A protein has these predicted regions:
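Conserved C-terminal alpha-helix-loop-beta "cap" of PLP-dependent enzymes
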Residues: 307-424
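Ordered hydrophobic segments in well-structured contexts
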Residues: 87-88, 327
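Aromatic- and Gly/Pro-rich donor/ligand-binding loops
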Residues: 59
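Generic structural marker for isolated residues within well-ordered, non-membrane alpha-helices
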Residues: 74
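Acidic, PIN/NYN-like endoribonuclease modules and their adjacent C-terminal/linker elements
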Residues: 36-40
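Conserved PLP-enzyme active-site core in the AAT-like
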Residues: 4-29, 33, 43-49, 53-56, ...
Length: 424
């Protein structure tokens, strides 16, 4: 391997360091594979139970009436995630869009939205209206309240109890850490939180932002009481093949409203052409457990590499994993740029490009992003990003195969090593 890695620009010293780290990860990788095997069987059973056949891959145009493949895919998602219904559409452009649909469809003027997990992901601030924006929830008369996490990253149950009131209509729970240096929540933790909230107010809608968490465990938040789970098809469930799309799975009453919000009242799920995307959406979902396992191995490897070098990493090298994201606190903008340039240099697409920080819509500071992906913005593919602000943390995720994720981490280390920012 030394020769081919050398041709990619990875030195013998960096490769050797990676191999030392890798020797201790066999047991962790076996556990990841066991989860993937279970989830592969779960997806397979869902497809068989819904009698997926070759006609499901035919696309539709125009209104999209009688699109059997589109409708059956939604049944597959609902069965796999244990929900009454699902909305799985290429017309949902990204995770933020899916969340905006779910929120705006199920909140009316006078209702209150509660986040019991602190500040949401940056792009949702515009959706909610905490960063003023046209068409935000707050502009339409929805109020917002949030409860900060405890210092150790756990839920502040007394404060949550106090925050829930007669106006509380929907509780949003972000599973993954986003651009925060806090733990990602396990499905079990989310289930305990939902049970606590439902005990106080049984009719409240509990929605989980499931981005980056699908198929990391053998159960999903929908199996522990979530009324809706929401995600993006260019993350885990698309398996690297879905070129666009998002999903919302949950109670029929919630999904019906989401479908009306996506299209129009009275139209709902009856319209929405799938064009020629059905095959990719089915095949990507089928491959997702295996692709997610490769990304998880990459995250575990990254945690152990950078922890061994003395950096703060979340999760650490031995903690259980609840999403595919690995945060590394690098301490400087220079180190963030070097890390991301290494990830970009390891990409199959745009490997010659040098990522630099820039202003992105929805973010309140410059952001650097590295992603030489087949699908623009796909974070199940090898990618890294982060806001250029203290403590200068970079967030690594993805890799369509474990071996590509490994190469990306080694290349990120190579760039830091070349700039004298780390010593091996």
């Amino acid at each position: 391997m030394e020769q081919i890695y050398s041709m990619l620009g990875i030195s013998a010293e960096v490769e050797a360091f990676g191999n030392v780290v890798l020797k201790d990860l066999k047991e962790r990788f076996e556990k990841i594979d066991a989860v993937a095997e279970y989830n592969q069987a779960k997806v397979l059973r869902a497809m068989q139970e819904e009698r997926v056949d070759g006609t499901c891959f035919a696309g539709s145009t125009g209104y999209g009436y009688n699109d059997n493949g589109r409708d059956k895919l939604e049944k597959v998602y609902a069965r796999c995630f244990g929900t009454e219904a699902a909305l799985v559409r290429p017309q949902i452009t990204c995770g933020t869009h899916a969340l905006a649909i779910a929120l705006s469809a199920n909140l009316l003027p006078g209702d209150e939205l509660l986040s019991p997990v602190g500040k949401p992901y940056d792009t949702l601030e515009n959706v909610i209206g905490t960063v003023p924006s046209a068409c935000s929830l707050m502009e339409y008369g929805v109020s917002y309240r949030q409860v900060e996490l405890m210092e150790n990253g756990t839920f502040d149950y007394p404060a949550i109890r106090e925050a829930i009131n007669e106006k509380t209509k929907l509780v949003t729970i972000q599973r993954s850490k986003g651009y925060a240096m806090r733990p990602t929540f396990s499905v079990q933790q989310i289930g305990e939180l939902i049970a606590f909230i439902k005990e106080i107010k049984p009719d409240v809608i509990c929605m989980v932002d499931n981005c980056y968490g699908e198929f990391v465990d053998v159960i999903e938040p929908s199996n522990v009481g979530a009324d809706m789970i929401v995600g993006s098809l260019i993350k885990n469930p698309g398996g690297g093949l879905a070129p666009i799309g998002g999903y919302i799975c949950g109670k029929q009453s919630c999904i019906d409203r989401c479908a009306y919000r996506l299209s129009a009242p009275g139209l709902g799920q009856e319209v929405g052409a799938s064009l020629d995307l059905n095959r990719a959406l089915y095949q990507g979902f089928f491959l997702s457990p295996t692709v997610t396992a490769g990304a998880l191995k990459g995250a575990v490897f990254a945690a152990n590499v950078y922890e061994k070098l003395g950096f703060r990493v979340i999760p650490n090298g031995t903690e259980p994993r609840h999403d595919i994201i690995q945060a590394v606190e690098l301490g400087s903008a220079e180190a963030m740029e070097a890390f991301c340039q290494g990830i970009q240099a390891a990409a199959p697409v745009d490997s010659y490009v040098t990522p630099i920080p820039y202003a992105m819509p929805g973010y309140n500071c410059d952001v650097i992003m590295a992603a030489g992906a087949f699908i623009q913005g796909s974070s199940i593919e090898l990618s890294a990003d982060g806001p250029i602000r203290a403590p200068y943390s970079v967030y690594f995720q993805g890799g369509l195969t474990w071996f590509h994720a490994k190469t990306g981490i080694l290349m990120s280390l190579q760039k830091l090593y070349e700039k004298g920012l780390v010593k091996i």
